[in-house]
């Protein structure tokens, strides 16, 4: 919590790395995964622009892989509340869209959390969202329409408009989900839109891998900055050559001056002239 509080005052140049390290520490030392979810949501609210996809993907993976207890229901309810304000960071919308599409049914019986309410809360962000987020929302809408009868008349016009979207991913998803209901039986559609299976649990989390990659990128950047460029090396070589040429000219001029100033050499010149 102290690190999260310090993040507000941290320099923008180090925030991304700080967010990544806080996320790793929160996962590593979490005694309660609900606290871990809350910590990541704090990171999103404080410094959402610096929360990478790897961080929120990891939240989704952990929540999906822990069906026991109330973690999935807790996360769905918490994210629905987090996405309720109209001004909400887009990363929070992405996480909420995915989690509600998978586990929103666990809280649909609670006051203010029905399937229709879930759709309305998510869809208020549609206009301000990037295409990547809209693609996630389209998949969530398909799942909500499959689970809740009251969502179908709300989702249908959205999909109809999306079929003409300039974004290929949004256009394709909406067209496929619309055609799915017409081409398959309700049982087949339900089977196709059921919640995702658990993710493969790798020994090294994607967050730790991302941190190592970032540290490697930073080291490479420092080394590159310290190493002179080809143009700099060429200029240095030209400067050295010019310096050597100037030194040679100066040495030659000094030698000639010494000859003129040497008395013995001057008398030799007069003697030689007398012989002729």
How would you name each of these model-derived features?
Residues 1-3, 16-17, 31-40, 53-54, ...:
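Short sequence/structural elements of tandem HEAT/ARM alpha-solenoid repeats
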Residues 15, 22, 33, 52-53, ...:
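Residue-level detector of extended alpha-helical repeat arrays and alpha-solenoid scaffolds
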Residues 20-24, 95-102, 138-146:
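Contiguous, well-ordered alpha-helical segments that form the cores/surfaces of helical PPI scaffolds
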Residues 48-51, 67-72, 86-95, 106-114, ...:
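A glycine-rich, aromatic-flanked flexible loop/lid motif
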Residues 106-136, 140-276:
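Acidic, serine/threonine-rich low-complexity intrinsically disordered linkers/hinges in large eukaryotic
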């Amino acid at each position: 919590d102290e690190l999260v509080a310090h993040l507000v005052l941290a320099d923008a140049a180090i925030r991304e790395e700080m967010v990544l390290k806080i996320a790793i520490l929160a996962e590593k030392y979490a005694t309660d995964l609900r606290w871990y979810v809350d910590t990541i949501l704090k990171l999103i609210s404080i410094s959402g622009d610096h929360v990478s996809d790897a961080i929120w993907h990891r939240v989704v993976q952990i929540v999906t892989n822990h069906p026991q207890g109330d973690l999935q229901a807790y996360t769905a309810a918490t994210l629905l509340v987090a996405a309720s304000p109209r001004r909400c960071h887009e990363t929070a919308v992405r996480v909420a869209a995915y989690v509600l599409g998978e586990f929103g049914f666990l809280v649909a019986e609670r006051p203010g959390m029905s399937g229709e309410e879930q759709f309305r809360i998510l869809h208020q962000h549609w206009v301000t969202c990037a295409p990547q987020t809209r693609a996630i929302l389209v998949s969530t809408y398909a799942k909500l329409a499959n689970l809740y009868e009251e969502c179908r008349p709300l989702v249908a016009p959205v999909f109809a408009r999306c079929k003409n979207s300039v974004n290929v991913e949004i256009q394709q998803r909406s067209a496929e989900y619309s055609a799915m209901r017409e081409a398959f039986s309700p049982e087949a559609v339900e089977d196709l839109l059921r919640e995702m299976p658990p993710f493969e649990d790798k020994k090294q989390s994607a967050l730790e891998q991302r941190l190592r990659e970032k540290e490697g990128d930073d080291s490479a950047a420092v080394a590159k900055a310290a190493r002179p460029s080809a143009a700099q090396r060429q200029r240095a070589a030209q400067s050295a050559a010019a310096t050597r040429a100037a030194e040679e000219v100066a040495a030659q001029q000094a030698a000639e001056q010494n000859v003129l100033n040497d008395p013995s050499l001057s008398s030799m010149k007069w003697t030689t002239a007398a012989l002729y």
